[in-house]
Amino acid sequence: MSITKVSPDLVDLDSGITITTADNTAQLTLISTDTDSGIGPVLDLKRNPNEAGADADWLGQIHFTGHNDAGTPEDIVYAKITGQIDDASDGSEDATVRWYIMQGGTRRESLSLGPSETVINEASVDKNFRVESDGNANMLFVDGGEDRVGIGTASPSTLLHAKGGSASSIIRVD
């Protein structure tokens, strides 16, 4: 590997860097000593500096990699986060960030945050979705295998099933 100092703030490497430690300490620490109210430190994943971006360009990925338990353990990307340009047009730039997780040996898109929608379970797998409130663990529950929605219940028996306490109104329509 060669390292070239391009400027006081820029170093050019001709290949990747591996940082290794033999314990659970951080392998990379970014420290900002700036004491103003601005954000710091900043990790910037930048693609093709000084080049025009294009629609559908992938901007970067963060991989969460570990070994499986095969006889000869294999590197598996168990989760990843990606960023992509949807529209590179000056003044109307759009992007999408996607979260992928390994499920049953296949990496699947779990969450997508795009310019016009947020999608959960784009891969249409049998995966439940649950929102808790302060007093209800199943305030909103989507049963991915049964294609049902529960409000106040984790076992909806119809397409939309609302369950309330004995003394409370379940649904109010004005």
Task: Set out the residue ranges of the language-model regions.
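Short, intrinsically disordered N-terminal pre-domain segments
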Residues: M1-D14, L159-L160
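Trimeric beta-solenoid/beta-helix "fiber body" segments of extracellular/virion adhesins
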Residues: S15-D75, I85-D174
